[in-house]
Amino acid sequence: MFACDNGERELPLTFGDLSQIIQDMSEKQIFDYCSNYINKIGVKKEFRKIEIDNLFQLIQIREKFFPLEPVIIKYYKEKRKSAVKHLLPITQEQINTITDGMSTKQREEFVNRRYAQLKERNYVKDAYIANYKINDSQWHEDIRFFDANEFNNKIDILVGGSPCQSFSNYGKKLGLEDVRGTLFYDYARIIKESRPKIFIYENVENVTKNDGGKTWEVMFDVWQSLGYHIEWAILDAKDYNHPQLRSRLFLIGFREDIFTKPYTFPPKMELTHRSTEYLEAGPIDDIYYLGKKGFEWITTPSKNLRRSRVNQDVIGCETANQQDNWIGDFRVEHPLPHHYTDTRIYVGQFDFGDGNGRVDAVGRKMTPRECMNLMGFDDTFKIVVNDSIAYRHAGNSIVVPVLKELIKSIIPYIS
């Protein structure tokens, strides 16, 4: 077993990186390079006021260079009270320039070392290592620089996908034009290098509709070029006895030498579970209950917002909100729980539609454990990250019961 991150954490562009990149450039070339770089990365909010001239002055190629970070901090201390605490991000193109001449393995080791130097936790790695039989040597920081050749013909099933935000109704729908969408090509590259017997690719349903279907045509052509028999379908979690409306694309590739008989996706199952079965028993901490504004937000109808409540048999789709990485699933409770003490918790009026009219009720967001449960993870799954990260992990996950049914359906092709 091994795991790859999608390289979402940004590596800083260091003084040494710039020195190496621009060492043979003229001043005009340096200026043009900085201009193009600024435009390409889409400068972050805290850097928008740094004119290109200012950046150019920071990168002097004569007698000595001046480190970027202290100068930027000084600049911002003069312009505003808050100081910038990190450098500009490095691009994949810049990494390729710096590591020119290195082997694929050496390039990956270089990138891994750079990630190790970051003074921030990799929460995805924390969750993997806490829950699966995987160690540091089996963890790869950035899929873009992962060398999969060492796994050639050693993998039975490869499961993965590219970030869904590029294609999701909740995202910008830029598809393959989004840098996150282009990670699809890295997943395809890993398949080409490692040649697994079977691979499973998961993404949002909208990937087939993006740009009038053109994105999907491009992606499908790539899949077919890899030498695999391809099957795909849109599967909904509720059709596999799991109470969540979550339609997702599942594409399965069978290596041609093992595809000896037709494949059919798992048949639909009767839904016997209810969403309330996955809620935590006992008192829920006050921090999950809503104040007046939050209660009114989830109980006021809106045509522009999809809000789901766990007061029904099947909940709406859990999603990692793209702006604050927060899952928008809520529960309205009546009778009122007796355990809470926080005076900020708001008691509002709510009609459950049961004929009893409007009653006093409180609202709360789901706990991270409940979100994990509703994605199919049982209580043995360790949550070792803070709530906001746990919500994100749950919202970005594959529904476990659906994946289990898929795995069962493809095992005969391996054995």
Where are these regions (language model features)?
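Conserved SAM-binding loop
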Residues: Y128
